Amino acid sequence: MSWIQIPWSWVVTLIVTYLSLPLIIYYLVPYIFYGNKSSKKRIIIYVLGDIGHSPRMCYHARSFSEKGWQVELCGYVEEQVPGFIAEDPNIIVHALPTLTLQGNKRSIIFLVKKVLFQVSAIIAQLWELRGSNYMLIQNPPSIPILPIAVFYRLSGCKLIIDWHNLAYSIMQLKFNGNFYHPVVLASYVIEYIFGKFATYNLTVTEAMKEYLVNSFGLNPKRCVVLYDRPATQFKPLTESESRTKLLDSEFIRDMIPEGFNVEKGDKIIVTSTSFTPDEDISILIGALKIYDNSYENLDKSLPKILCFVTGKGPMKERYVKDVEEHDWQHVYVKFVWLKSEDYPRLLQLCDYGVSLHKSSSGLDLPMKILDMYGSGIPVIAYNYPVLGELVKYNENGLKFLDRRELHESLIFAMKDPELYKKLKQGALKESQIRWNSSWQSAMQELKLVA
């Protein structure tokens, strides 16, 4: 009987493989695919922006935490994160490293360097967080997070995209409306192709849902509208709270001009802006200049206006200079950058909020209006078709298209107490609809929570 000759190297290989299988199955595979998997449901929430000034994503984090999920909140930490995030034991904040580059921020070379740096940082974070059940990203931006998130699905992680707007439309605005600019085209292609691979989709308006379903081919059964709603920190003043007393609070006291008196009818308005082309603050400044001139030349009964402009962004210094160079007589304009906990306190003290958001896509709604409604203040908003899903003219706000119309709205708003009373009631009614109930309803529709 002849024996089959088997090389000893094969025998050794088979024995080593056989002995290694338990190690591979029980240690290596879990290490690669599961990492530090939690016994709780675990979700990664990505913010390619400052976490402290990304309220909707922070609200998501808190809502998932309240359901007992482990939340890994990833993003830039430029300012202090909100207390309700920092103090929540179910939420861990993972700071993305920042890259400081000099040069033209619109150049292709600059953008490529920035994207490559972000890709390496995000991949490194996702490796550490492998084993998560879900990943929630906001869009925009789509580059580079959307393709990375889609490929991350190969680990078994389900992807949720929260469509705040369309990234390509914002890029198109930055590049002077040129849809065929390479960056704009790349953004459009990435959204169009990779957006289809999400397990679930959330949108901020019905109009955006319709667009994504009809133009991007998203599954309507896996796409749900989740309107922005104010969180609990945005609330109207109660009857027992004195507005005059609160105006003497440390965070605002030094910003109240001498001789300005709300008890004598002076008015406070506020706008929040990122100083970008889709929020033209020159409309507000121009309207306030006309208002100031109206007081001097036409109507001495007009109340003084104190206007707070909150936020920061690339075009801020230009507007600050414009305001400083004007000889104001009856209007005060203050540019402020507030802590996240002070912004709701400021809104409570205002008579009106002003929204300058134009919407690059025409499909989104500004979160700032919801914060204003949550604080019980009516809104004067730049008008575009989708705005009607939120702002009802002469019910909870007023609308305008240019500085002249905004000036007229300011005149009506400042002088007509009956109009203010009516709009105030509409805003207070809107303030009763809160984030938690809207979030719960949307997540139940997607069968993500019970």
Swiss-Prot record:
Q: Which residues lie on this side of the membrane: Cytoplasmic?
A: 35-106, 128-450
Pfam families per the record? Glycos_transf_1
**What is the protein's membrane topology class?**
Single-pass membrane protein
Single GO MF descriptor: chitobiosyldiphosphodolichol beta-mannosyltransferase activity
Q: Name one GO cellular component term.
A: cytoplasmic side of endoplasmic reticulum membrane
Report the EC number(s), separated by commas if there are several.
Answer: 2.4.1.142
Could you tell me which InterPro entries the record lists for this protein?
ALG1-like, Glyco_trans_1
Q: Which Gene3D superfamilies match?
A: Glycogen Phosphorylase B
Membrane-inserted regions that do not cross the membrane: 107-127
Q: Where does this protein chiefly localize?
A: endoplasmic reticulum
Record topological domains on the Lumenal side = 1-13
Keywords for the protein's UniProt record, in alphabetical order? Endoplasmic reticulum, Glycosyltransferase, Membrane, Signal-anchor, Transferase, Transmembrane, Transmembrane helix
Query: Coiled coil where?
Result: none
EC top class named in words: transferase
Q: Does the keyword Lyase apply?
A: no
Spell out the family assignment given in the record's similarity comment.
Belongs to the glycosyltransferase group 1 family.
- PANTHER family per record: BETA1,4 MANNOSYLTRANSFERASE, CHITOBIOSYLDIPHOSPHODOLICHOL BETA-MANNOSYLTRANSFERASE
- Report the function annotation for this chain: Participates in the formation of the lipid-linked precursor oligosaccharide for N-glycosylation. Involved in assembling the dolichol-pyrophosphate-GlcNAc(2)-Man(5) intermediate on the cytoplasmic surface of the ER.
What is this protein's name? Answer: Chitobiosyldiphosphodolichol beta-mannosyltransferase
Q: Which organism is it from?
A: Candida glabrata (strain ATCC 2001 / BCRC 20586 / JCM 3761 / NBRC 0622 / NRRL Y-65 / CBS 138)
- The gene coding this protein: ALG1
